[in-house]
Amino acid sequence: KDMNQLRQFVDNWKDKKIGGILVLGAVQGDKVNLISAVSEEAIKAGYHAGKLLKEVATRCGGNGGGRPDMAQAGGKNPAELGTALDYVSTWVKEQQA
């Protein structure tokens, strides 16, 4: 999926007022597209989409960042996308500590 499709998914998620944290990743050719969104409630609890996605992106050869509510990133190592996405739960737990 390209970044526009991922952004559409995030917009739909936001429109439905689903709380929490959303992180999506997709391989496009030899690149990785990543996007994250954080609900208002989660932002108030200290979560930040840009900080999260920066950490996730580094795990698949990329970088990125963004606002507290939404962030985008790219990566250069599609084989590591699964590992990068697995890190999300670790990051969330670390923020709770």
Give a label for each model feature:
Residues 1-97:
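Glycine-rich, acidic loop segments that terminate in or are immediately followed by a histidine
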